[in-house]
């Protein structure tokens, strides 16, 4: 499993993924090209990359084309102010200040049979036990109908937030946007967070496995 990682504000996600057996390559912004991206099974974008990496405004087209051609793009949280790109996603996606600060907040699985929640790991509410600090932050609160929200969660007294994990088919690939705080859960060794992230990285591969079998 070759994973390309575009760094943002700095997080331990690349090292965490290496520890569980992924081959992770850091991709510098200037290395984002159609040729280079084809080497990877999935591309992950680090936290707040779209707030701080100027070059992404020129490279976003290549990342979205990578998805269109069958790639798997996983974007972690960005703040809703001062984005470097107008087209964060291939479809309308609007970030908000929505967050869930209670790390034990109930998580409802909206699409239990969705491939991302089924392969290779069957994700259940148990995978959201033992999280630290928060569930996530800066969730999108508006999105195009092409997106499927997979989870709902909220702090006490707040409305249900369904923007924590959104997936959209684009061309032959999958675009995934998540405000879940994987960057906090990995250092704490939260197994459910690892299991879910493994599914994000495998998105689109479930059919290949069926063909092999």
Label the model's feature ranges.
Residues 1-46, 77-79, 94, 99-102, ...:
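Aromatic-Pro/Gly-enriched surface loop or interdomain linker
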Residues 10, 14, 37, 60, ...:
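Extracytoplasmic/secreted envelope proteins and their assembly/folding machinery
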Residues 29-32, 57-61, 159-165:
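Alpha-helical scaffolding within the catalytic cores
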Residues 36-38, 67-68, 159, 169-171:
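Extracellular/periplasmic catalytic domains that process cell-envelope and extracellular macromolecules
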Residues 48-129:
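A glycine-rich, often tryptophan-bearing local segment used as a flexible ligand/cofactor-contacting loop or short
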Residues 99-190, 208-211:
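Catalytic beta-strand/loop cores that center a nucleophilic Ser/Cys/Thr
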Residues 192-204:
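Short amphipathic C-terminal alpha-helix that caps PH/PH-like domains
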């Amino acid at each position: 499993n070759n994973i390309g990682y575009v760094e943002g504000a700095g997080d331990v996600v690349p090292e965490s993924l290496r520890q569980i057996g992924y081959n992770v390559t850091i991709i510098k912004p200037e290395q984002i090209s159609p040729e280079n991206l084809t080497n990877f099974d999935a591309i992950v974008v680090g936290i707040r990359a779209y707030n701080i990496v100027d070059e992404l405004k020129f490279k976003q087209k290549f990342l979205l084309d990578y998805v269109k051609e069958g790639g798997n793009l996983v974007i972690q949280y960005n703040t809703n102010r001062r984005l470097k790109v107008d087209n964060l996603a291939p479809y309308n996606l609007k970030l908000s200040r929505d967050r869930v600060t209670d790390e034990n907040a109930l998580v409802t699985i909206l699409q239990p049979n969705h491939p991302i929640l089924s392969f290779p790991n069957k994700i259940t509410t148990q995978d959201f036990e033992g999280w630290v600090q928060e569930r996530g932050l800066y969730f999108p609160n508006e999105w195009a109908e092409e997106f499927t929200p997979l989870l709902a969660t909220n702090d006490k007294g707040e409305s249900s937030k369904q923007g924590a994990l959104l997936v959209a088919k684009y061309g032959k690939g999958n675009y995934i946007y998540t405000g879940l705080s994987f960057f906090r859960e990995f250092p704490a060794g939260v197994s459910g967070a690892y299991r879910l992230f493994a599914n994000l990285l495998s998105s689109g591969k479930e059919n290949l496995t069926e063909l092999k079998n």
